[in-house]
Regions:
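Catalytic cores of DNA base-excision repair glycosylases
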Residues: 2-3, 10, 14-184
């Protein structure tokens, strides 16, 4: 097993040289982060940037999203594909405004109870909005860990094994930025 400290240094060094600039990385607003996370599911970042900006211009708050028509949400979602994501975003917004008095939950289970929000998305929202050190993986993070720690193996590596490494390497003081570094 390769050294954890060396891995962390490698990731931070790369990030400091190649950090990508996205609008959702400049906010701690959980609604904005949630919108970005849903848009980024199976969609390239370059395609998401203009859609994200336009969506938030039309629906700047969870209340504005909840009160919008399905038609307006789907028109703004056009070009991202998987319309169900946009519809779930609206339905979850309606629940947040109605049942949760407009407050986006800060607990994983409460977020996962909303339409369209799973384990990764719930933890990403909390981590990126509140810098809470939660353990999660997505495709890019998985690839980084496989390439670094399992580069010479041809064995199937289970997510639980990768999650243990994610937990060991997590920068608990700056988890938000650490995950951005892993994704870059």
């Amino acid at each position: 097993m390769r050294d954890i400290k060396k891995f962390q240094k490698t990731v931070w060094d790369y990030y400091n040289q190649h950090k990508r600039d996205f609008p959702w990385r400049k906010t701690k607003n959980p609604y904005h982060i949630w919108v970005s996370e849903v848009m980024l599911q199976q969609t390239q970042t370059d395609r998401v940037v203009p859609k994200y900006k336009a969506f938030l211009k039309q629906f700047p708050t969870v209340r504005s999203l909840a009160s919008a028509s399905q038609k307006d949400v789907l028109e703004r979602w056009q070009g991202l594909g998987y319309n169900r994501r946009g519809l779930n975003l609206k339905r979850a917004g309606e629940e947040i405004v109605g049942r949760l008095k407009g407050k986006i939950p800060t607990e994983v289970d409460a977020l996962m109870a909303l339409p369209g929000i799973g384990d990764y998305t719930s933890k990403a929202i909390i981590t990126f909005a509140h810098n809470t050190p939660l353990v999660f993986i997505e495709t890019n993070i998985r690839t980084v860990f496989l390439d670094y720690f399992f580069q010479n193996t041809h064995v199937l590596v289970h997510d639980r094994e990768i999650l243990r490494l994610v937990e060991k390497t997590l920068d608990i003081k700056n988890s938000r930025e650490w995950y951005y570094a892993l994704m870059d």
